[in-house]
Design a protein with these regions (language model features):
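C-terminal structured "cap/appendage" subdomains that terminate the fold
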Residues: 280-331
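Function-dense linear segments that define catalytic or interfacial modules
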Residues: 75-160
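Structured core elements
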Residues: 11, 70-72, 82-85, 89-94, ...
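Short, contiguous acidic/charged loop-to-helix segments that flank catalytic cores in large enzymes
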Residues: 60-61, 137-139, 162, 257-266, ...
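Conserved catalytic core of nucleic-acid polymerases
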Residues: 70-71, 75-78, 153-286, 292-293, ...
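Short acidic (Asp/Glu) and glycine-rich catalytic loops that position anionic groups and cofactors
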Residues: 3-13, 19-24, 83-84, 103-111, ...
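Flexible loop/turn segments at secondary-structure boundaries
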Residues: 80, 91-93, 123-126, 134-135, ...
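Conserved "right-hand" nucleotidyltransferase catalytic core of DNA-directed polymerases
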Residues: 2-98, 114, 121-124, 184, ...
């Protein structure tokens, strides 16, 4: 890849140059790919090489005598409180590439069983609706409306039914970006638009959902006073960066203050759901068992004659994990392998 610039005689607006030449980092090449076919080929090759080394070869080396791969779950590694997976990391099976997703096909249940996958739907946005008490967001969820399409309609000033797929995708980036404390610069990079346009999108977003702006500002102010962020369930995350003399560190601390209560609450909820589901499977004497947690998703190895019971347990255990102003929702699927179940 390092010779690409020379061989193609590329003239790159804003091309990043390092000590050894122009950067060939993925984010740089992705911007070039539409104009230079060889760059797209390089990115594809890198992706395939990563799939082979990390997942095809890497996972095969982790298979134990019982034919299974056993991961380790960690409760205290991530700052947000999410459970992480190591040796190997089974929460990191790729989802962006179709070929990467197909790696999930190699994960199969034992004979007489199937996989049942239950995934929270927009849990962080639902937590935001509850914690901010924004009436518009709460009302949209209670009416089971398309949140991203509603946001697009408001931000881009078009009737709901005329929102394009592109506008909806951009609105989705704004909705989730707000949760992560995204800046106008960060949003402009994500959407390939100017910083001015991104700032206008965010301003219109906060006009649409005014209580969210007040809520986020309040989180930062409270964290400055106390030195920590707190989840809905009272779990604290210290934020020493807020008292730093370095502007960049303070800005980072402010983003933590914005997103930790939301992300952390979602992490708390999935843990409660795991306990609920595990207890119910045990109390009802089922042979089905909880295998894996991947962020907002639970994977159950389900005996085929216990399918309806497990569905009921997942519905109750996950939806009942927290009492919010809006209902928790899950998407549930079954399959003969992890790919089909997802």
């Amino acid at each position: 890849a390092s010779d690409v610039y020379k061989r193609q005689e590329m003239h790159l607006p804003g091309g990043k140059k390092t000590k050894t030449g122009y950067s060939t980092a993925a984010d740089v090449l992705e911007k070039m790919a539409p104009d230079y076919p060889i760059v797209a080929d390089i990115l594809e090759y890198r992706g395939l090489a990563k799939l082979k080394s990390t997942y095809a070869d890497g996972l095969a080396s982790c298979i134990k005598e019982d034919g299974r791969i056993h991961t380790s779950f960690n409760q205290t590694i991530t700052a947000t409180g999410r459970i992480s997976s190591t040796e190997p990391n089974l929460q990191n099976i790729p989802m962006r590439m179709e070929l990467g997703r197909q790696i999930r096909k190699v994960f199969i249940p034992r004979e007489g069983y199937e996989f049942m996958d239950a995934d929270y739907s927009q849990i962080e946005l639902r937590v935001l609706a509850h914690m901010s008490r924004d009436e518009k967001l709460i009302d949209a969820y209670r009416k089971e409306e398309d949140i991203h399409r509603i946001t697009a309609s408001q931000v881009f000033h078009v009737p709901f039914e005329e929102v394009t797929d592109l506008q909806r995708r951009n609105a989705k980036a704004v909705n989730f970006g707000i949760i992560y404390g995204i800046s106008s610069f960060g949003l402009s990079q994500d959407l390939s638009i100017s910083k001015k346009e991104a700032a206008a999108y965010m301003e219109q977003y906060f006009e649409t959902y005014p209580k969210i702006k007040d809520f986020i500002d309040g989180l930062v102010e409270e964290a400055r006073k106390t030195g920590y962020a707190v989840t809905l369930f009272g779990r604290r995350r210290p934020i020493p960066e807020l008292s730093s003399n370095n502007f960049m560190q303070r800005s980072f601390g402010e983003r933590i203050a914005m997103n930790s209560p939301i992300q952390g609450t979602a992490a708390d909820i999935i843990k409660i759901a795991m306990i609920n589901v595990w207890k119910s499977l045990k109390e009802e004497g089922l042979s089905s068992r909880l295998l894996l947690q991947v962020h907002d998703e639970l994977l159950i190895e389900t005996a085929k004659d216990e399918e309806e019971q497990v569905k009921r347990i997942l519905e109750k255990g996950m939806k009942g994990a927290a009492d919010l102003a809006v209902d928790l929702a899950i998407d549930m699927h079954t399959g003969e392998n992890w790919y089909e179940a997802k």
